[in-house]
C-alpha cells in the first residue's frame, strides 16, 4: 500500500493548524462559525487588493492571460420539512437516491398515476393508472418566450402539483428554473421561469438540485474575476424572466453578511469561487430564493444530507507547490435552515457525492484521494493518488481555523485505475475501480474493498472476476456490477463481519447502458428479496456513448437472499432515422433509460419508449409499449 504520502500531508496540515491557531479540531470551541463579511465595501476592497496584486504579477509573467484561461477552464470544467412529508415523497419515489427523503433532480418522476419525463428540451406526461399506458401532454421545457439557444435542460423535480425544470444557459449565463403546473389528469401548464447567476453546475455523476419537502436546494459555483468592472455582477442574484428582461433586474439574494470566509488566504492567481447554496420554497405562490455562499478554492465536490450541504474545496491544479506543502483543501458545512456555515481544514479530495456519509452517530465520513480533482464536469472520472477514509465528529466543525487531526484519516488500499466507484452500504464503505466512461478492458481479476467506516478494522479485499462500474445496496447487503471487457456481471456481497461474495449473475456480451446512479433501481419486497433493474447495451460499448445512443434493453433480476436470477429484459425498438425537431438539450447528458417500478407494475423507459412487462412466475414478459415521441404521437398541449 502506498499510503505514506497521504498521511504525511494530513500530519503537515494538522501541525500547521496547531502552530498558527490555538487549539485543534478535537478541541474546537462549540458554537464557532465562519466569519461573514461585514459589508459590501469590505468585499469591494478585497477585490481591489486582488486586482493590484495580479497586476503586479503581470509584470513578472504572463499572469493575466493565465488567470483568464484558468477562469474560463474553471467555468467550463468545473431546511428540512416534517418527517411525514419526506416519508410520503419517498414512498412515491421512482428515483435511486443517495439519502431517503432527499430527492435528486432527474429525467423521470412520478406524480400520482402519471409519469413525467424530461427529454431533449421537452416535458412529456404518460398516464399509468390502472392498466393504462398512454401519452397525455407535452410542453417545451424552456417555457413561453424563452430562447432555448445555448441552454441545457437537465433535471426535474416535482413538489405537489409544481414541476421544476432545472437548466443552464450559456447564452444568459446562469441556472434556469422553469416552473410548470401538472393537473391530476397529467396536463401541463407553463407558469414562469427564473434565472440564478451561476457558472455551469454540470457533473458526470452529481446532480445540481435536491428537493427536501417543498424546499428546492441548489449548489452552484460562481468563479470570481477581480478584474470585472462590477465584481458584484458575479455574486448570487435572482430574477424572473420576461421578454426584454435586463441584467439590472437581477436582485441580490446573498448580501455581504451571508458571504463567508475562513482564515485561509485566497489567491485569484490560482482561482477563487463562491460556493453557493440556494434554497427556494416551491410551496409559495411566487418563488423566493435565498443564498448562502462561502469563498474558497475552485475545485469542488458537494453532498446533501437531510439538514446540510457539504462542499469540499481544493486548490487549482496550477498550485502544485502549495499542495505539496499543505492540504490546500477545506470542507464546509452549510446548514439548510439559514444558520452560519462551519468548516474544517482537510487533505485530499473526494471522488464524488457518494464519497460522503453524514451518519446518524453525528460523524462525517469521507473517502478521499491525495490527488483528486473534484467532480466538476468529468473530473470524477479520472483521479489519482493514495486513498484514505476521513472520519470526524460534526462537533469538530467550527470557524475554519482548525484541521482534521492526522489520526482521523485511515489509510486504505489503493486499487489500480482512475474511474473509482464508491458507496456506503450498511456499516461498510465499499470502493473499487472500473471502466467509467471508457470502453472496458479485458479483465480476469479485480477486487472491491469493504471497510467498516466507524471502527478501526482493516479493509477487506473481495476478489471479483470483473471491474467495478457500480456499487448499489441490496437492503443491508450489496451488489457490485461491472464488465470483464465482454460480459456484464452482477456480484452479490454479504456484508457480515467478514464480507464475502454470495452469487454472480452474468449477462453475456453486454455492458451497462447508463453510468449515472439513477440508471439503477432496486425495489425490495422484503428484507431479503427484491427486484433489480438496469439498462444494458451490447458488450464493449464505451460508457460515453450513452450521450447519443439509447440502451438496447432494461434487464430485470430477482434477488432472493442474495441469489440473483434473471427475470427477463424489455427491449427497445427505436424509430429509424426519426427527426424529433429537437431545439434544446439534444445530447442526453443525464442518460435516457431507466427501470421504473410503480406499485406492482414494471416499466422500462428507453428514449421515447415506455415498455411494460408483467411477471408470471419467474419470467418477465412484455404486455404493452407506447412511444411518446413528438414524431409519432400528436399530443395535446
What are these regions (language model features)?
Residues 2-11:
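Bacterial N-terminal signal peptides that target proteins for export
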Residues 10-21:
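Bacterial N-terminal signal peptides
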Residues 27-637:
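Beta-sheet-rich non-transmembrane sensory/scaffold domains
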Amino acid at each position: 500500500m502506498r499510503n505514506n504520502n497521504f498521511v504525511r500531508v494530513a500530519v503537515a496540515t494538522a501541525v500547521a493548524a496547531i502552530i498558527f491557531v490555538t487549539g485543534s479540531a478535537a478541541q474546537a470551541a462549540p458554537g464557532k462559525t465562519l466569519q461573514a463579511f461585514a459589508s459590501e465595501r469590505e468585499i469591494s476592497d478585497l477585490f481591489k487588493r486582488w486586482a493590484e496584486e495580479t497586476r503586479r504579477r503581470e509584470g513578472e509573467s504572463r499572469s493575466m492571460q493565465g488567470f483568464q484561461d484558468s477562469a474560463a477552464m474553471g467555468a467550463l470544467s468545473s431546511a428540512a420539512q416534517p418527517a411525514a412529508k419526506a416519508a410520503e415523497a419517498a414512498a412515491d419515489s421512482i428515483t435511486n437516491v443517495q439519502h431517503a427523503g432527499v430527492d435528486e433532480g432527474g429525467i423521470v418522476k412520478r406524480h400520482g398515476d402519471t409519469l413525467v419525463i424530461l427529454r431533449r428540451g421537452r416535458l412529456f406526461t404518460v398516464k399509468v393508472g390502472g392498466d393504462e399506458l398512454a401519452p397525455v401532454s407535452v410542453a417545451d421545457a424552456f417555457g413561453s418566450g424563452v430562447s432555448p439557444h445555448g441552454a441545457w435542460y437537465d433535471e426535474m423535480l416535482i413538489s405537489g402539483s409544481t414541476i421544476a425544470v432545472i437548466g443552464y444557459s450559456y447564452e444568459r449565463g446562469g441556472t434556469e428554473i422553469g416552473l410548470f403546473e401538472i393537473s391530476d389528469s397529467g396536463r401541463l401548464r407553463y407558469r414562469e421561469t427564473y434565472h440564478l447567476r451561476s457558472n455551469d453546475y454540470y457533473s458526470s455523476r452529481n446532480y445540481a438540485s435536491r428537493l427536501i419537502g417543498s424546499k428546492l436546494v441548489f449548489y452552484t459555483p460562481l468563479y470570481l474575476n477581480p478584474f470585472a468592472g462590477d465584481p458584484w455582477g458575479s455574486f448570487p442574484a435572482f430574477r424572473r424572466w420576461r421578454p426584454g428582461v435586463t441584467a439590472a433586474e437581477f436582485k441580490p439574494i446573498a448580501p455581504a453578511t451571508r458571504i463567508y470566509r475562513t482564515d485561509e488566504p485566497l489567491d485569484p492567481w490560482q482561482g477563487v469561487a463562491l460556493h453557493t447554496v440556494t434554497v427556494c420554497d416551491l410551496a409559495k405562490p411566487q418563488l423566493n430564493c435565498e443564498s448562502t455562499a462561502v469563498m474558497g478554492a475552485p475545485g469542488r465536490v458537494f453532498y446533501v444530507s437531510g439538514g446540510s450541504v457539504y462542499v469540499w474545496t481544493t486548490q487549482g491544479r496550477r498550485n502544485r507547490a502549495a499542495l505539496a506543502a499543505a492540504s490546500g483543501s477545506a470542507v464546509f458545512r452549510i446548514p439548510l435552515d439559514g444558520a452560519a456555515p462551519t468548516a474544517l481544514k482537510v487533505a485530499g479530495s473526494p471522488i464524488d457525492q457518494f464519497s460522503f456519509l453524514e451518519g446518524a452517530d453525528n460523524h462525517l465520513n469521507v473517502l478521499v484521494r491525495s490527488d483528486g480533482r473534484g467532480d466538476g464536469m468529468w473530473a470524477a472520472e479520472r483521479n489519482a493518488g493514495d486513498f484514505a477514509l476521513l472520519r470526524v465528529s460534526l462537533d469538530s466543525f467550527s470557524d475554519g481555523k482548525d484541521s482534521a487531526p492526522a489520526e482521523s484519516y485511515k489509510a486504505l488500499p489503493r486499487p489500480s485505475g482512475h474511474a473509482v466507484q464508491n458507496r456506503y452500504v450498511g456499516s461498510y464503505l465499499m470502493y473499487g475501480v472500473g471502466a467509467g466512461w471508457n470502453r472496458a478492458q479485458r479483465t480476469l481479476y479485480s477486487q472491491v474493498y469493504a471497510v467498516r467506516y466507524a471502527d478501526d478494522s482493516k479493509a477487506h479485499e473481495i476478489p471479483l472476476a470483473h471491474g467495478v462500474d457500480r456499487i448499489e445496496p441490496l437492503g443491508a447487503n450489496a451488489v457490485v456490477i461491472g464488465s470483464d471487457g465482454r460480459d456484464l456481471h452482477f456480484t452479490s456481497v454479504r456484508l457480515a463481519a467478514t464480507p464475502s461474495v454470495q452469487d454472480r449473475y452474468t449477462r453475456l456480451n453486454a455492458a451497462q447502458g447508463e453510468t449515472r446512479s439513477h440508471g439503477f433501481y432496486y425495489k425490495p419486497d422484503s428484507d431479503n428479496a427484491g427486484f433489480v433493474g438496469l439498462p444494458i447495451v451490447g458488450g464493449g460499448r464505451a460508457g460515453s456513448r450513452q450521450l447519443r445512443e439509447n440502451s438496447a434493453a432494461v434487464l430485470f433480476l430477482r434477488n432472493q437472499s442474495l441469489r440473483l436470477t434473471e427475470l427477463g429484459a424489455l427491449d427497445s425498438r427505436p424509430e429509424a432515422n426519426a427527426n424529433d425537431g429537437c431545439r434544446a438539450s439534444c445530447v442526453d447528458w443525464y442518460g435516457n433509460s431507466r427501470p421504473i417500478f410503480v406499485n406492482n407494475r414494471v416499466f422500462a423507459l428507453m428514449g421515447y419508449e415506455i415498455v411494460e412487462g408483467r411477471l408470471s412466475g419467474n419470467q418477465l414478459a412484455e404486455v404493452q409499449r407506447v412511444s411518446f415521441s413528438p414524431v409519432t404521437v400528436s399530443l395535446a398541449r
